From Swiss-Prot:
Single annotated GO MF: GTP binding
Binding residues for Mg(2+): T26
UniProt name for this protein: Elongation factor Tu 1
Source species, domain of life: Bacteria
Reaction(s) the record says it catalyses: GTP + H2O = GDP + phosphate + H(+)
Sequence positions that bind GTP: 19-26, 81-85, 136-139
NCBIfam families: EF-Tu, PRK00049.1, PRK12735.1, PRK12736.1, small_GTP
Gene3D superfamilies xref list: P-loop containing nucleotide triphosphate hydrolases (3.40.50.300), Translation factors (2.40.30.10)
Annotated InterPro entries: EF-Tu_GTP-bd, EF-Tu_GTPase, EFTu-like_2, EFTU_2, G_TR_CS, P-loop_NTPase, Small_GTP-bd, T_Tr_GTP-bd_dom
Every tr-type G domain range: 10-204
GO CC aspect terms: cytosol
Main location: cytoplasm
Region annotated G1, chain positions: 19-26
Length: 394
């Protein structure tokens, strides 16, 4: 069956849900697609199809990142439902990096919880520029003062991480009641959609920069070849463009013979879009998550760099003890972890949780990087620090 061609008319904005486990992120995602389909047209998605994580379905915990799309009169939104469960922070890091804005879901019945803080911190570190708050389960709280108190707490928490807590939109609603079709709660979803439209500016795309796309997944398609998927970070990729595959292994070249998005064919993939790129003559085993596709010559793989790092405090879920020179954690760049050796500055013997520190890192495998690239520092899947590449050494 031939694929329908994707028409690009409205501005395309990437958003997603973040917040504590069981506060209603997936229910809200379902409610948005259902209510907006009703009001503006589009395809409704039910809870079960968004919560598509077979490994963990039994316990009702979402693991994988789900992509849905919906429209308002002026925009097309691609929405990722990020996992809330602490074991899957890895997906949060790849998911949150794909947002022009995030919807922070906080249950009015609970208020901010540990993962609420963790996700706000991660949003700050991975560069999510805007956050809108959806206070969920408000139908279960009768006390007006309690709602005000939770709102105040959430706003203060956001301000603590340098988001404009006092000024950002906060909608009080109930995702479940909206999903069940109750008009007053459906209106709150429309209000949320209006806030997305007005508060998140039309993204300034990095479309004029050289093409680069971090690889998230690799598939082999019978008769067509190898497809790599990811979000285009900058530039444009067109059919028949030559590209380089950079990082982890020796740099190789390939030709892009096809671009698709949401199962529709495109002539090109642009910055900010989640696409699949078909690569000519590249074998499935020659490419892996953690590499990037890039315009030839535009980015080089490096192993050694100076960085500015913030080490999470114990309260933020970080380490409970200091670390010393010779520390060897994992450095999470874009979509993958690479082990690295840490050198501390002259005169610094140890680094305490909660400290800011300059460190020089030597990775065991090269990563495509430029100055300004963000990364997380992790130990056994747990985020213990966040940093930015300040200076490339080698």
């Amino acid at each position: 069956m031939a694929k329908a061609k994707f028409e690009r008319v409205k501005p395309h904005v990437n958003v997603g849900t973040i917040g504590h486990v069981d506060h209603g992120k997936t229910t809200l995602t379902a409610a948005i697609t259902n209510v907006l389909a009703k009001v503006y047209g589009g395809v409704a998605k039910d809870f079960a199809s968004i919560d598509n994580a077979p490994e963990e379905r039994e316990r009702g915990i979402t693991i994988s990142t789900s992509h849905v799309e919906y429209d308002t009169p002026t925009r097309h939104y691609a929405h990722v439902d990020c996992p809330g469960h602490a074991d899957y922070v890895k997906n949060m890091i790849t998911g949150a990096a794909q947002m022009d804005g995030a919807i922070l879901v906080v249950a009015a019945t609970d208020g901010p919880m540990p993962q609420t803080r963790e996700h706000i911190l991660l949003s700050r570190q991975v560069g999510v520029p805007y956050i809108i708050v959806f206070m969920n389960k408000c139908d279960m709280v009768d006390d007006e003062e309690l709602l005000e108190l939770v709102e105040m707490e959430v706003r203060e928490l956001l301000s603590e991480y340098d988001f404009p807590g006092d000024d950002l939109p906060l909608i009080q609603g109930s995702a479940l009641k909206a999903l069940e079709g109750e008009k007053e709660w459906e209106d709150k979803i429309v209000e949320l959609a209006n806030a997305l439209d007005s508060y998140i500016p039309e993204p300034q795309r990095d479309i004029d920069k050289p093409f680069i796309m971090p690889i998230e997944d690799v598939f082999s398609i019978q008769g067509r070849g190898t497809v790599v998927t990811g979000r285009v970070e900058a530039g444009i990729i067109r059919i028949n463009d030559e590209i380089e595959i950079v990082g982890i292994r020796d740099t190789t070249k390939s030709i892009c013979t096809g671009v698709e998005m949401f199962r529709k064919l495109l002539d090109e993939g642009r910055a900010g879009e989640n696409i699949g790129a078909l690569l000519r003559g590249t074998k499935r085993e020659d490419v892996e998550r953690g590499q990037v596709l890039a315009k030839p010559g535009s980015i080089k793989p490096h192993t050694t760099f100076e960085s500015e790092v913030y080490v999470l405090s114990k309260d933020e879920g970080g380490r409970h003890t200091p670390f010393f020179k010779g520390y060897r954690p994992q450095f999470y760049f874009r979509t993958t972890d690479v082990t690295g050796d840490v050198q501390l500055p002259e005169g610094v013997e140890m680094v305490m949780p909660g400290d800011n520190v300059k460190m020089t890192v030597t990775l065991i495998a090269p990563i495509a990087m430029d100055e300004g690239l963000r990364f997380a520092i992790r130990e056994g899947g747990r985020t213990v620090g966040a940093g930015v590449v300040a200076n490339i050494v080698a």
